[in-house]
Amino acid sequence: MFLEFIQKYPFILAFILGIMPALIWMWFWLKEDTHPEPAKMITLSFIGGMLSVLIVLPLQKIIYTYVHNQETLSFTLWASIEEIFKFVFVYFIALRNKVTDEPVDDIVYLIISALGFVTFENTLFLIEPIKNGDIIGTIINGNMRFLGASLLHIMSSATIGICMGLAFYKSRSRKREYLTLGIILAIILHASFNLFIINRAPGNIFSIFGMVWVGIIALLLLFEKVKSIRNLQI
């Protein structure tokens, strides 16, 4: 009976499985913030990340139609759209809001937006195997996306946040420069990961995920660096 129910309403289970990794990562990163952000802004940033998927997917389909035979270009454009729209949504929700009052806040809100994005993305990926009653496939896809996609989105969005955090107390022009650098680095990171996944043999996928984990460790160190930044002009 349970199997019949989830096959009839696959979105429910897919969403539960899609949001669980996001909640784990959200708890992990929020506890790193010594000055917790308002729950309302966290929630809105998460929802904003989810909503950005609704714009990103149609644009990615258009790109695929025209450049699907140019692998590097198509993956770069896909990554660009994802990183830009994740940023744009959270920028208008939180980053330009007065609640963003310390360097580390940029990282936190961008990670929350990324988790909203990956929750919706994970949900869409899991619907089909659930609908087909492929429980094993659902578990495998869920775990792989927990290890790969979730970490990738966290790391790429946090890259933008780190650059913004490093420039938090700098001039407006320097902030724009750091932001531009952050977006470029995030796109390169995101596109490179996707290209590695496609071009590497299946047996090497875990080594790629290992590289992402190394990146997360580096992210943690940079997170602590940004937390230590103070406004010397005060």
Whereabouts are the PLM-identified features?
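Hydrophobic alpha-helical segments at protein termini of multi-pass membrane proteins
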Residues: M1-I234
